Regions:
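Buried hydrophobic packing segments
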Residues: 3-7, 11, 103-104, 127-130, ...
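A general structural signal for well-ordered alpha-helical segments in protein cores
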Residues: 4, 97, 124, 166, ...
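Beta-strand segments within the central parallel beta-sheet cores of soluble alpha/beta enzyme folds
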Residues: 21, 146, 186-188
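Glycine-rich phosphate/pyrophosphate-binding beta-alpha loops
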Residues: 45, 152-185
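Glycine/threonine-rich beta-strand-loop-alpha-helix active-site module
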Residues: 1-82
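Carboxylate- and glycine-rich phosphate/diphosphate-binding segment that chelates Mg2+/Mn2+
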Residues: 53-161
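Gly/Pro-rich interdomain helix-loop hinge
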Residues: 176-214
């Protein structure tokens, strides 16, 4: 989906020859409205179908480049649970961890808002139940559908706040060591959660049970 989102704004601006050069030189030009994008996620984790971001990995330089702006929102987002029931355990777990990371990083983000907090908390409450269920029962469509909801909600949350340190630390792990993105994001979450737990409880005291389940 990220590739489609980037190409949708790059093609009308004639910036695809080659596209990597525009990222390597820096995004100093104006990017305008692009082609319509219908985003249909086949995993439950990135939330890219509802975010104004797109990430491109430059393997030759081992760098991550991002585009962000209102012009990056897909025109439509379609979620079909049938596209996720055949996912492997890894392709269920790693994106699921990414969704949880999005929700947590949005919660303790300095840019958090009441709206982003509500979406993050709802995403977490769904994911902590639905992800183990989807891993245990891969063809449980209700669990798969709930993970799609968690992914979408956490995507909407980071659309307001962006991500935070867990994602920043994850990028070298992915680019230099090939660690899958969601797994790389999850490595630091236990310690970050420990550090931020007092703030989270103070912010949402009625969610103590949820935080204890993480």
């Amino acid at each position: 989906m990220d590739a489609a989102k980037v190409l949708a704004v790059a093609v009308p601006c004639n910036r695809i020859n080659p596209l990597a050069n525009f990222f390597r030189r820096g995004l100093d030009a104006t990017w305008g409205a692009g082609l319509p994008v219908v985003a249909i996620p086949t995993t439950s984790g990135t939330g890219a179908e509802v975010t104004p971001f797109a990430t491109v990995w430059d393997r030759s330089t081992r760098k991550k480049h991002s585009l962000a702006g209102h012009f990056m929102y897909p025109t439509h987002a379609l979620l079909d649970v049938e596209l996720t029931v055949s996912l492997s355990r890894e392709d269920t777990l790693y994106p699921g961890l990414d969704a949880i990371s999005h929700a947590l990083e949005s919660l303790w983000n300095k840019h958090s808002t009441p709206v982003s907090t509500a979406m993050s908390l709802e995403a977490l409450s769904i994911a902590v139940e639905a992800l183990p269920q989807a891993l245990e029962r891969p063809f449980d469509r209700f669990a798969r559908e709930r993970m799609q909801q968690a992914s979408l909600l956490s995507g909407l949350a980071i659309s307001q706040t962006r991500t935070a340190i867990a994602h920043s630390i994850s990028y070298p792990l992915t680019s230099y060591f090939g660690v899958p993105h969601g797994l790389a994001c999850s490595f630091t979450l236990p310690e970050l959660l420990r550090l931020n737990l007092p703030m989270l409880v103070a912010k949402s005291p009625h969610q103590r049970t949820l935080f204890a389940a993480l």
